[in-house]
Amino acid sequence: SLVQCAKKKNVHLLTGHHRRHNKIIREAKDTIDSGQLGRLVTSHSMCWLFKPNDYFNSWRESISGGPVLINLTHDIDLMRYLIGEIESVHSFESNANRKGKVEDSAVVSLRFKNGTIGTLSISDTIVAPWSWEHTSGENPIYPNQKESCYWIGGTHGSLELPKLKSWKSLNERSWWEPIQSNQSPTDNNINQPLSAQLDNFISVVQGKEEPVCSGEDGLKTLLVIEAIKLSATIGK
């Protein structure tokens, strides 16, 4: 494989999952890794959007062209980056709306190796604001809806992304006690992750940094995506 070849030749192999380079994601990872949320318990991710008919040329209607392979791979990579490695998945797919050869919607249950469990849903047939494309402001082609699309919860707090809105107890941790929110400022984000990704690439070539997303990271995310497709096919 490419990963094995790169290791054998002692060269770096990078994967273009640009969302990892987003300063919002970097701050979220710092928050999680610092233990501010406590022990992670569960997560929920949404990618709901509506793709117009002229989006679907022939290859996007084929078995390799659905939103799980095209879009969900980025969400899975971020969950791995923020929460940890994924141990098992169970998924359902549907093509009930577009009635094509490939799925238009899917839901996935995730179990992470650290004990966190999560859910994820994706559809390209829903008119909605809850997707990374519409909420992050990374790409100006997508109208920014200023909503969240990822939620990560722990024993001492929870976090919404990309709003960077955190929630924690004021006093005792109890559903009878008040909780408060704090939202970190998020600056103009247009194209920032792509330039940061290029900076990392240059620094890796110069021997100054390690890859933010290695070839092995890309392979691990791809293996999760393949497991999601297999689970939907065999019903396990």
Tell me the role of every PLM-derived stretch.
Residues 22, 73-80, 192-199, 216-223:
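A structural signal for well-ordered alpha-helical segments within the folded catalytic domains
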Residues 11-15, 19-110, 131-132, 235:
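Predominantly a Rossmann-like dinucleotide-binding segment in NAD(P)-dependent oxidoreductases
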Residues 1-12:
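Rossmann-fold NAD(P)-binding glycine/threonine-rich loop
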Residues 99-103, 113-196:
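NAD(P)-dinucleotide binding in Rossmann-like oxidoreductases
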